[in-house]
């Protein structure tokens, strides 16, 4: 059985990993053994943070809605409850955009929520 030399495959694998590690600091972008660890960890962080991003954005939207609704004299939970009772089906992402960019419309939504709560 002939001897198998893996030079081509090894070089290709090394090149692939070092290309992924391009831009990393120091040995992480130059030394294969360190780069493998760095790229693996980066992949783990990316996987975790793709899931966290959804939570973080929802928190941001809720914070913005809360701040805007409190200016109009209504807490976030009472505002959302009022919208539900008034059968207004606008999700938090859109509510946050309205709160930031269209204050008049948001003030109208707060009034709708207040009427539904009364």
UniProtKB/Swiss-Prot annotation:
Where are the bilayer-spanning segments?
Answer: none
Q: Which GO terms describe its biological process?
A: ribosomal large subunit assembly; translation
UniProt keyword annotation of tRNA-binding present: no
SUPFAM superfamilies cross-referenced by the UniProt entry: Ribosomal protein L20
Which GO molecular function terms does the record list?
rRNA binding; structural constituent of ribosome
- Give the UniProt family note: Belongs to the bacterial ribosomal protein bL20 family.
The protein's name is Large ribosomal subunit protein bL20
